[in-house]
Swiss-Prot record:
This is GRB2-associated and regulator of MAPK protein 1. Residues 12-320 are annotated as: CABIT. Isoform 1 interacts with EGFR. Isoform 1 interacts (via proline-rich domain and phosphorylated at Tyr-105 and Tyr-453) with GRB2 (via SH3 domains); the interaction occurs upon EGF stimulation. Isoform 1 interacts (phosphorylated at Tyr-453) with PTPN11; the interaction increases MAPK/ERK activity and does not affect the GRB2/SOS complex formation. Isoform 2 does not interact with GRB2. Keywords: Mitogen, Phosphoprotein. InterPro entries: CABIT_dom, GAREM, SAM/pointed_sf. Residues 558-572, 631-640, 648-658 have a biased composition (Polar residues). Residues 498-550 are annotated as: Necessary for interaction with GRB2. It comes from Homo sapiens (Human). Residues 496-572, 626-664, 738-763 are annotated as: Disordered.
Length: 876
């Protein structure tokens, strides 16, 4: 146990900290390599109590899970993991699917449609053009170009008919003359016919295509690459890149030997390659009497706790020569690259189905029938191969990963005691790429091969269901800690023990997500029906940290309230641009339900300088979360608690809160958070106004229930912070100035009322709510008005018509409808936009394709809207 004293660097002389640190927190907080000591009471196989370790580095390993086979293709041996950069060669055997489904070849799309296999592969480059008619009564035509490349994998989805244009030429002796001068169409009649098509999903382009039956070309139920792989010997990486798992292989020649192999692959053995897995491990060296014992800890399993040198924990300088000395010894006796390429047995003491806390929220073993698991594997293999082919260069078999600083204050790994919360979701989407497999302590999204790529983002915005095992005192301490750092965007649910809080540095280092090919509308439709976003978030960090780039506030996917049109609900739900921070998915963790002292609010206001110049993460994230209160709020929840919830202001539909009176009121809004404390209002009002200022999207659809005291306080607060309705001219100047400096929308309809007036004249600006939609929409005004009144041109107080601002992204749904009327669009188009709940943020993202194909607008209407978005305004 005692290192050799002759080395002059004895580990016994080091003073160790009394605070034990989990390994995942250690590697993300301190730079490696580091010396550590196993904490007392930790039981780790292969380690003794108080063992010294050199924590060498973090590595990202990509391995192929394989089963040993016997002659009859029965699984007989242990499950093993073969690194993707394993140097041995394999030869493909006859596959199980070749026996069940012999290889078929086709010479046209029509032959494919008759057989209708699950998938086909393109055996040659195919180009096909067809002239498609726009409609039965429309003379417009469009040339549809179809291009398929050799090796394209097509999943068959169904059949359909399209209208194609066919020309009937009149017999005339002038045809030759007209043909020479290019005017043959002048004496031709345009006809239409129906052409049967095969709808397929092209996995190379990630788009759906319609292949006419007339299209000729060679297709096969096996990939041409896989057919070419039948001959010769290949590396395991070559096999997984060019074939569809699972595949059966044999070892044709003696494989190379690795001193760290725990499973020996021998000549003549047969294996079934099942799937690909990527995991992050921490490689360590146990230091015993100048003897090095290498070992590793996967970060998706339970990790032990270690004690660190006390000087390191306190942030003081300490002799790093000790680390360099032991690192030199390790490098002499230990080859980490060889160690990373070793073949190992898969541990059987934990179930693969329980790796992800998101899959069933299992706390123990979750047994799934083998037939179901195999069927799921079969269905998702195309996704595995797609990810391997598209991101083939990212198949890291032995790449070092720098996790230092990955736990920033923006909501990523929280230092949970592992005996309290064994299953905890990650808060940083960037860590999903550092940990492609779900880790029960640090990563919450599974990236293992059982899940298709779409499903990685399926539960992005859903509240996590974690076991509530903490005591009440712990919860109170968490709330206090969270409240003290909320202005700095910290979301650590538990106080950091000891002095570790000072050592957790904020950093934006995160691996960029892989590029995602664009998807066609048909595939998006399928994803919409699955309630999964078709395109994952492009940014690993949900919030921009640069002050020059305003964060985009996007709307989460609606779970229960869908638009009548499935095509349009995709846009209004924000699925095409979703970026949900996980820190807000759990209202019990992110939403304060107790009043904080006013000095905390003041601290927030001072730190932010202006609630709009430098918005906090809370100001944005409160718009991104779908509050769990609406899906199951307790009726005993008081109205004051309801008022204090900072995420109660919406521009999208929400569910009716049970047990609350139908009384509507305007939401008070503060334009300068610093002056808010000057007014003699109650702490409840101040807190509520501060929380609403974090959600300045629209007060048109705001609080549904308040009591009279809160309403009166809000009116007083509103009169001190918001200009009254007459006159409106100063209001416009203020908005113009604010819009130039603020990345967040400042147009607040709830602040435009005269706070001292309760006459029905105020109903002119109110949003109309259909009777059938009462449970979805909640108007914030005390009265409801007919559609023709609320959609009428808004008066500014001096009789002039309402004019849209230069920046349209901050408009509410109501103001978008007024903008459309401002440019002269018809009422049916305006009501259509209202029905689809298009606000300014969605309006500026609309394209000509969306407006014409999905919204079914005419070319003139599309042109008007696009020019309006680009800055055009009609002259008055």
């Amino acid at each position: 146990m005692d290192p050799a004293p002759s080395l002059g660097c004895s580990l016994k002389d080091v003073k160790w900290s009394s605070v034990a640190v989990p390994l995942d927190l250690l590697v993300s907080t301190y730079r490696l390599p580091q010396i550590a000591r196993l904490d007392n009471g930790e039981c780790v196989e292969g380690l003794r109590e108080n063992d010294y370790l050199l924590i060498h580095s973090c590595r990202q390993w990509t391995t192929i899970t394989a089963h040993s086979l016997e002659e009859g293709h029965y699984v007989i041996g242990p499950k093993i993991e073969i690194p993707v950069h394993y140097a041995g060669q394999f030869k493909l055997l006859e596959q199980d699917r070749d026996i069940k489904e012999p290889v078929q070849y086709f010479n046209s799309v029509e032959e494919v449609a008759k057989a209708f296999p699950e998938r086909v592969y393109v055996m040659e480059d195919i180009t096909f053009n067809v002239k498609v008619a726009s409609g039965e009564c429309n003379e417009d035509t469009e040339v549809y170009n179809i291009t398929l490349c050799t090796g394209d994998e097509l999943t068959l989805m169904g059949q359909a008919e399209i209208l194609y244009a066919k020309t009937f030429k009149e017999k005339s002796r002038l045809n030759t003359i007209f043909k020479k001068i290019g005017k043959l169409n002048s004496i031709s009649k345009l006809g239409k016919g129906k052409m049967p098509c095969l709808i397929c999903m092209n996995h190379r382009t990630n788009e759906s295509i319609s292949l006419p039956f007339q299209c000729k070309g060679r297709f096969s139920t096996r990939s041409p690459l896989e057919l070419q792989m039948q001959e010769g010997e290949h590396t395991i990486r070559n096999i997984v890149e060019k074939t569809r798992l699972p595949v059966n292989v044999t070892v044709p020649s003696p494989p190379p030997r690795n001193p760290y192999d725990l499973h020996f692959i021998r000549e003549g053995h047969r294996y079934k390659f099942v799937n690909i897995q990527t995991k992050t491990v921490v490689v360590c060296c146990v230091l015993r009497n100048n003897k090095i014992l290498p070992m590793h800890f996967p970060l998706h399993l339970t990790v032990p706790k270690f004690s660190l040198p006390e000087h390191l924990v306190k942030g003081e300088s300490w002799p790093e020569t000790l680390v360099h000395h032991w690192l030199g010894i390790c490098q002499e006796q230990f080859d980490i690259d060889e160690y990373s390429r070793a073949v190992r047995d898969v541990k059987t003491d934990w179930n693969e189905e329980c790796k992800s806390p998101k899959k069933g929220r299992c706390s123990g073993h979750n047994h799934v029938p083998n037939s179901l698991s195999y069927a799921r594997d079969e269905l998702t293999q195309s996704f595995h191969r797609l990810s391997v082919c598209v991101y083939g260069n990212n198949l890291h078999g032995n790449s070092e990963v720098n996790l230092h600083g990955c736990r920033d204050l923006g909501g990523d790994w929280a230092p949970f005691p592992h005996d309290i919360l064994p299953y905890q979701d990650s808060g940083d989407s960037g860590s999903d790429y550092l940990f492609p497999e779900a880790s029960e302590e640090s990563a919450g999204i599974p990236g293992k091969s059982e899940l298709p790529y779409e499903e990685l983002w399926l539960e992005e915005g859903k509240p996590s269901h974690q076991p509530l095992t903490r005591s009440l005192s712990e919860k109170n301490r968490c709330d206090q800690f969270r409240g003290s750092v909320r202005s700095k965007c910290a979301t650590s649910p538990l106080p950091i023990p000891g002095t570790l809080g000072a050592a957790v540095k904020s950093s934006d280092t995160a691996l960029p997500p892989p590029p995602v090919p664009p998807k066609s509308e048909a595939v998006r439709e399928e994803c919409r029906l699955l309630n999964a976003p078709p395109v994952p978030p492009r940014s690993a960090k949900p919030l921009s940290t640069s002050p020059s780039i305003p964060p985009r506030t996007v709307k989460p996917a609606r779970q229960q309230t869908r638009s009548p049109s499935p095509t349009l609900s995709y846009y209004s739900s924000g699925l095409h641009n979703i970026s949900v921070t996980k820190t807000d998915t759990n209202p019990s963790e992110s939403t304060p339900v107790s009043c904080y002292p006013c000095n905390r609010v003041k601290t927030d206001s001072v730190d932010l300088k202006s609630p709009f110049g430098s918005p906090s993460a809370e100001a944005v994230s409160s718009r991104l979360s779908w509050p769990n209160h609406y899906s199951g709020a307790s009726e005993s929840q008081t109205r004051s608690d309801f008022l204090l919830d900072p995420s109660r202001s919406y521009s999208y539909p929400r569910q009716k809160t049970p047990g609350t009176p139908k009384r509507n009121c305007p939401a008070p809004f503060d334009f300068d958070g610093c002056e808010l404390l000057a007014s003699p209002t109650s702490p409840v009002t101040a807190e509520f106004s501060s929380s609403v200022s974090g959600c300045p999207k629209s007060a048109s659809y705001s609080l549904e229930s308040t009591d009279v005291k809160s309403l009166a306080a809000g009116v007083t607060k509103q009169s001190t912070s918001c200009p009254a309705l007459p006159p409106r001219a100063p209001k416009l100047v203020e908005e113009k100035v604010a819009s130039e400096t603020s990345p967040l929308p400042l147009k607040i309809d709830g602040a435009e009322e005269d706070p001292k007036s309760g006459s029905p004249d105020l109903s002119e600006d109110q949003y109309f709510v259909k009777k059938g939609m009462q449970d979805i929409f909640s108007a914030s005004y005390p009265f409801s008005s007919p559609l023709h009144l609320q959609l009428a041109p808004r008066s500014c107080g001096d009789g002039s018509p309402w004019q849209p601002p230069a920046d349209l992204s901050g408009l509410s749904i109501e103001e978008v409808s007024k903008s459309l009327r401002f440019i002269g669009l018809s009422e049916d188009v305006i009501s259509f936009f209202v029905t689809e709940k298009i606000d300014g943020n969605l309006l500026v993202q609309l394209t000509e394709e969306i407006l014409s194909e999905d919204f079914k607008l005419s070319k003139l209407q599309v042109k008007k809207i696009m020019q309006f978005i680009n800055g055009w305004r009609p002259k008055i």
